Amino acid sequence: MVKIKIWSTNVKVLDDFVGKITDIVKKTGVRMDGPIPLPTKRMKIRTMKLPHGEGKKKYEKWEMR
């Protein structure tokens, strides 16, 4: 049994690649379970808007999935 984990920040590219793999597996006649989507990890970053730190402390929020 072989397990393959594939990740990408671009969902469309990931779906196309997984589709190609499933087509190859179906042509060869091998039994396949999946694809099973893994939970989405989120990276959240807060940065100050002003670089010098004086005045009001206002933050920008960035998120990467």
Swiss-Prot record:
Subunit comment: Part of the 30S ribosomal subunit.
Family, as annotated: Belongs to the universal ribosomal protein uS10 family.
Keywords, alphabetical: Ribonucleoprotein, Ribosomal protein
Role according to the record: Involved in the binding of tRNA to the ribosomes.
Taxonomic lineage of the native organism: Archaea, Thermoproteota, Thermoprotei, Desulfurococcales, Desulfurococcaceae
Gene Ontology MF: a single term: structural constituent of ribosome
One GO-annotated biological process of the protein: translation
Database matches in SUPFAM superfamilies: Ribosomal protein S10
InterPro entries listed in its UniProt record: Ribosomal_uS10, Ribosomal_uS10_CS, Ribosomal_uS10_dom, Ribosomal_uS10_dom_sf
Pfam families, per database record: Ribosomal_S10
Any one Gene Ontology cellular component term annotated for this protein: ribonucleoprotein complex
Record flagged with keyword Nucleotide-binding: no
Source organism, top-level taxon: Archaea
Protein name listed in UniProt: Small ribosomal subunit protein uS10
